A protein has these predicted regions:
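Central cavity-lining transmembrane alpha-helices of secondary-active solute carriers
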Residues: 42-56, 257-269
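Cytoplasmic helix-loop-helix junction between adjacent transmembrane helices
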Residues: 92-130
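A late C-terminal transmembrane helix in Major Facilitator Superfamily
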Residues: 335-367
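Extracellular/periplasmic helix-loop-helix junction of adjacent transmembrane segments
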Residues: 20-51, 250
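Helix-breaking motifs and short loop linkers at transmembrane-helix boundaries and internal kinks
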Residues: 31, 62, 83-89, 117, ...
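Glycine-rich segments within core transmembrane alpha-helices of 12-TM secondary carriers
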Residues: 121-148, 345-356
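Conserved MFS/SLC helix-loop-helix module at the cytosolic interface between two early adjacent transmembrane helices
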Residues: 50-85, 274-277
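Extracytoplasmic gate region of multi-pass secondary transporters
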Residues: 19-20, 211-264
Length: 422
């Protein structure tokens, strides 16, 4: 199962990397200003938010069908992205591609969390995330020769089509998770698909006023804090480095590959720290480190200093992403796990990812450039660290069923921070 699911992070790594690297080329093709780039990135991320609907379906039809079909739709819209002839079609097709890619990743995380032993869940999510390095390296290596050829940035999207079709074929052998199979057996025939889907949607938002309200709001706020590092790094680094700091395509490609190679050890460290010292300390430390690193990245001018800050930013972001994804998948019961995950990660937790690129694009003119605009939003992860320290429960080593049963309303509508379990 792990092998069949890790392909999602490989393609996510590749997709994020080529969007990351090709931004200057795309901006040149469509004659875009910083504000245009920010608006494009925000609309593309709107697709990620709409993945909430796709992941919600996994609580009704199962985990396996969703991860099997999302890869096909992602392949289709990746192809359409490569064939787009204007900014509107490019943005629209990329937004739809992100809808299915983000949905696929969300369900894959749920499946790993449900199938791995309790004491290894953190490492399981870390393994899923760290395989994205393969896609990052591929994107970085292809960028120079492909984007510089007559194929341009479109060639970067064409490259991923054949592997995606192969993955779609192999996914036919994927099995359903044991927890979901048992859940469906218990509730077989109780409601129709349409009524069940309506119930899932109602239940998702009903959770905002129910026993899991605090957990939903907390996890959503944490993802928003994480995205204040991830969104500007992905959207603007390449443009900032090439246009404002006069880096070459080769230098940018090499920097991204190096950053993600070293950053992969962030997933390894996160998996170890999550299961050894706990969720709270790991999450807090990664948030603070990410805030400091991205501020340095966009406030330094020297090549060595920028490269070092880029590596530190990616490393911290990978630790933070793994830590937050682990919380997202642990804090809700099986019957609403996928729905709650998608509500917190893909919908409510993506508000800053949606707004930050547009905000930075607008602020860049007022604050004297991209560097100052990014620095203005870098405080976000520090706020996230404070929220974790004050309100997040310690979930290390606890069975999912125990965590679901322990939910109770307190200040902030969530459980008080629990003491770390042995």
């Amino acid at each position: 199962m792990v092998g069949l699911l890790t392909s999602v992070t490989i393609f996510e790594g590749y997709d994020v990397t080529i969007f990351h690297l090709c931004t200057p080329d795309i901006a040149r093709t469509f004659h875009m200003s910083d504000l245009d780039v920010g608006a494009m990135a925000s609309i593309v991320r709107l697709g990620e938010m709409m993945a909430f609907v796709v992941v919600m379906l996994a609580d009704r039809v199962g985990r396996k069908p969703i991860v099997s079909y999302t890869v096909l739709f992602y392949t289709l819209f990746t192809l359409m992205t490569a064939l787009s002839h204007g900014l509107r079609t490019f943005t629209g097709f990329q937004s739809l591609a992100q809808l299915f890619l983000s949905g696929e990743f969300g369900v894959a995380t749920i499946m790993i969390s449900e199938e791995f032993p309790d004491r290894w869940r953190g490492r399981g999510v870390a393994i899923l995330n760290m395989t994205g390095l393969i896609g990052v390296i591929a994107g970085g290596l292809f960028y120079g020769p492909v984007a510089g050829s007559r194929w341009g940035w479109r060639g970067m999207y064409f490259i991923g089509i054949a592997p995606l079709l192969l993955v779609a074929l192999l996914r036919r052998n994927l099995r359903e998770t044991v927890r979901f199979t048992e859940l469906k057996r218990k509730h077989r025939g109780e409601t129709s698909f349409v009524n069940g889907l309506r119930e899932s949607a109602a239940q998702a938002f009903r959770g905002l006023s129910g026993p899991y309200r605090g957990r939903l709001l907390l996890v959503a706020m944490l993802w928003n804090c994480v995205m204040l590092v991830g969104a500007p790094a992905v959207t603007f680094f390449s443009l900032y480095a090439i246009r404002d700091r006069l880096w070459t395509r080769s230098q940018v490609g090499s920097a991204v590959v190096l950053a993600y190679i070293i950053g992969t050890f962030g997933h390894v460290l996160a998996g170890y720290m999550l299961d050894r010292v706990g969720r709270k300390l790991t999450t807090c430390a990664s948030y603070v480190a990410g805030a400091a690193a991205i501020m340095l990245l966009f406030q330094t001018a020297g090549h060595t200093e920028m490269l070092t800050a880029m590596v530190a930013t990616v490393f911290a972001f990978q630790v933070a992403r793994t830590a937050t994804a682990t919380y997202s998948a642990e804090l809700f019961p099986t019957e609403i796990r996928a729905t709650s995950y998608s509500l917190t990660v893909q919908l409510l937790g993506r508000i800053t990812a949606l707004l930050t690129p547009l905000t930075i694009g607008a602020l860049s003119r007022w604050l004297g450039g991209l560097g100052n605009a990014v620095a203005a939003v870098s405080i976000g992860p520090v706020i996230g660290a404070v929220l974790v320290a004050l309100f997040a429960p310690e979930t290390r080593g606890k069975p999912l069923e125990e965590l679901a049963a322990s939910s109770r309303e307190t200040t902030f509508g969530s459980e008080k921070a629990a003491a770390p379990s042995g």
